[in-house]
Amino acid sequence: MESSILDSLGVEIIGVMAPVSICMFLVVLLTYSLSVTSDPQIRSAANLIYIENPSDSTTVKLEGSLANAIVFVVLIAAVTFILVLLFYYNFTNFLKHYMRFSAFFVLGTMGGAIFLSIIQHFSIPVDSITCFILLFNFTILGTLSVFAGGIPIVLRQCYMVVMGIVVAAWFTKLPEWTTWFILVALALYDLVAVLAPGGPLKLLVELASSRDEELPAMVYEARPTVSSGNQRRNRGSSLRALVGGGGVSDSGSVELQAVRNHDVNQLGRENSHNMDYNAIAVRDIDNVDDGIGNGSRGGLERSPLVGSPSASEHSTSVGTRGNMEDRESVMDEEMSPLVELMGWGDNREEARGLEESDNVVDISNRGIKLGLGDFIFYSVLVGRAAMYDLMTVYACYLAIISGLGCTLILLSVYNRALPALPISIMLGVVFYFLTRLLMEPFVVGVTTNLMMF
């Protein structure tokens, strides 16, 4: 039976929703603290066609915002296909360096501008040299934490949240109509790109899965968790070992990889003849020549930690006389103290029976990965709602969290990569306009008439 996120649903949901909630809360806090307003004259990839003016008619705003959203999605799709081609032709190092440059640019320029705005708004007494040193160290550490090995996962998670906050804070400066059309267009694009045949994101995931490689992308990875019910089974089905061959990253650090059971058994059989300290198995040798052993002993004796070369040669010569089943039975008995100590004794047979399930993805061991774009556009929606009223902020937050929970449930059912934007964004947009057009007038009316406090 395949493992599911439902086995540890609460921990998985909290591990994803907590950083999303923190990101949205800090974006709302920045919006209120810095009094962020839409800048109609801002020029970016999101408004290449039409620059919104307050004096424009509704029809002009509608047509211009729709054109901006279409162009923005087309640009994102084109860049994504370029990334697919680069990854297909093994330009992985180039992609990693590009991601590091992107992180440096976001933290250094966009984050630096927000940092200066905070200093000016709150009149923080700091000189320019100290400010530059702090910003430089903060940027360099964030850049190194993207793909460098040996970085604590908590630090990497924090920088992913920070980059989401910085980009979302800049997106909130876009005009209102353009922002809403871009959010809806991105939700639809995410749905097509991940699920449609030939979609760029689907091609990336399938290509990475076929190569058994990690995607060179900015994703938030929740800490992997294993439920108590699956812990014993996962020990047998997906043994974890520290491998120094193919699992060395660019920085030279050794990564933790999942080793299949048949690989472990094969390594164990190959190394059993090369170990300096061999376990000596002395069998009853009544049917063996008298020259091999003079003292016949009944039963089986084991000396697990004997390093004598002669004893090793004797053990090897005796072991080669048996068939493969005898070798496996001897190894089972020799390893029984270690197996019982590590709690794998009951799962040895089960592990052998699960060798054919190498392609099963164990989500409970890997954890859930959420793209940085999901953090950004969740926060953009809430930040845009914060420019109107706190009531719309509450409604949009509940809608986004509910949509994310539905996505996690679907993830556990289908056990494949799913888009995280469509459900949450659609619910958030619907809740925003329902709250703004229906709920807020009703609440304000009954409150002013002292019918509700």
UniProtKB/Swiss-Prot annotation:
Keywords: Endoplasmic reticulum, Golgi apparatus, Membrane, Notch signaling pathway, Phosphoprotein, Transmembrane, Transmembrane helix. The chain crosses the membrane at residues 9-29, 69-89, 104-124, 133-153, 160-180, 181-201, 370-390, 393-413. It is found in: Endoplasmic reticulum membrane; Golgi apparatus membrane. One of its GO terms (cellular component) is Golgi membrane. Homodimer. Probable component of the gamma-secretase complex, a complex composed of a presenilin homodimer, nicastrin, APH1 and PEN2. Belongs to the peptidase A22A family. This is Presenilin-like protein At1g08700. It comes from Arabidopsis thaliana (Mouse-ear cress). The lineage of its organism: Eukaryota, Viridiplantae, Streptophyta, Embryophyta, Tracheophyta.
